Amino acid sequence: MGTSRDPRVRKMTVLGYGFPDPMTRRIVRLILLSVATSASAADRVPLPLELPKPLFVGTPVPFKLANLEQPTGVKRPPFLVPAGTVNLALGKPVTASDTDPLIGEIPFVTDGNKKGTEGTYVELGPGLQWVQVDLGAPATLYAIVCWHFHAQARAYHDVIVQVAGDLKFKTGVRTLFNNDSGNTAGFGAGKDLAYVETSEGRLIDAKGVRARYVRLYSNGNTTSALNHYVEVEVFGRK
């Protein structure tokens, strides 16, 4: 059988519609999807993330948590994002549930200083607390990185990361991370694991969600009932 000279027919054949066999059409579509996925991956670059120096000081306090992620001791692999992705949170306004921090200032959360030493973190009161970053406009988000307190090996309770287009987080809320396994915060039992703080921070895949506001919850830690934030970075594109 000769090849049709009609470009519309050739296009249909390439897309799989010219094949009567359903299996053949399925295979062709999978091949095209694979090619498109490969092209998309080729456009991605490592996340432009600068890590602070390790800062563990003193004697670690032993603790046990039922849902604790076991440290691997292996450096986190590069996280790929579209080219042009930047930290949209740098210098952006921050609000918090505790408006009178015990230590530090709320703007420390997005000031770009991730050292974790005295004068670079904010300490909020006990119980469930949150900080919220206003990116200024809706953006496509790819990763959120949070450093609570990396001068000591500790884990924070009920860590929940949500994004929304609504300032009050009443509508259109998306939960990207939740390790509140007991539903203490009331957002549903989380399936993510608690983790030990390190200078790498915790990288959360934002999966390309569109949002303007980012809110992070915590409920004390394995050392005290207080809540801390060294830095929050939100990587995306406007």
Sequence positions of predicted segments:
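N-terminal pre-domain segments of enzymes
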Residues: A41-T85
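Hydrophobic h-region of N-terminal signal peptides that target proteins for export
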Residues: L33-A41
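Sec-dependent signal peptide recognition
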Residues: M12, R25-L32
